[in-house]
């Protein structure tokens, strides 16, 4: 798996904080959640807003920026909490192998193109086979309720 990631700009960091605060209050679309995970070194609780993909009755997290800090922390912790308003749920992470990611990546881009298109070299609506070569650049996890 590729270890690089695209760091957020200063504007994106400010937007993520504001949007994360709103999602934490329970606002946002049905797929918006605040992901909470313990830092792998500090043990501190970190939060970031995410788009949760539901596909064939399963829940998936995709990291459109690559191996970000939340990805590294989540892999180390083995579990995350999704929060929206007063509702919280813990999940165990199951990493998706690269060969199984194309369908998930396509669905993610097609569903959330307005928010994530800039992180993908393909256009939303591209055929699933076009995602084969990209799979290693985008960590993806199935969420399993704890």
Predicted regions and their residues:
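Short beta-strand segments
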Residues: 30-64
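Short, structured beta-strand-loop surface elements
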Residues: 58, 65-146
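Alpha-helical membrane-targeting segments
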Residues: 1-32, 117-126, 133-135
């Amino acid at each position: 798996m590729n270890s690089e990631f695209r760091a957020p700009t200063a504007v994106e960091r400010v937007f993520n904080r504001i949007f994360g605060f709103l999602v934490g209050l329970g606002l946002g679309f049905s797929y918006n959640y605040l992901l909470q995970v313990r830092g792998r070194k500090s043990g501190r609780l970190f939060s970031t807003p995410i788009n949760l993909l539901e596909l064939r009755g399963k829940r998936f997290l995709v990291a459109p920026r690559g191996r970000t800090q939340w990805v590294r922390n989540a892999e180390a912790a083995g579990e995350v909490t999704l929060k929206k308003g007063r509702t919280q749920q813990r999940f165990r992470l199951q990493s998706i192998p690269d060969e199984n990611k194309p369908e998930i990546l396509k669905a993610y881009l097609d569903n959330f193109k307005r928010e994530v298109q800039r992180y993908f070299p393909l256009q939303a609506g591209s055929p699933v086979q076009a995602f084969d070569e990209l799979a290693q650049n985008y960590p993806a996890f199935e969420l399993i309720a704890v």
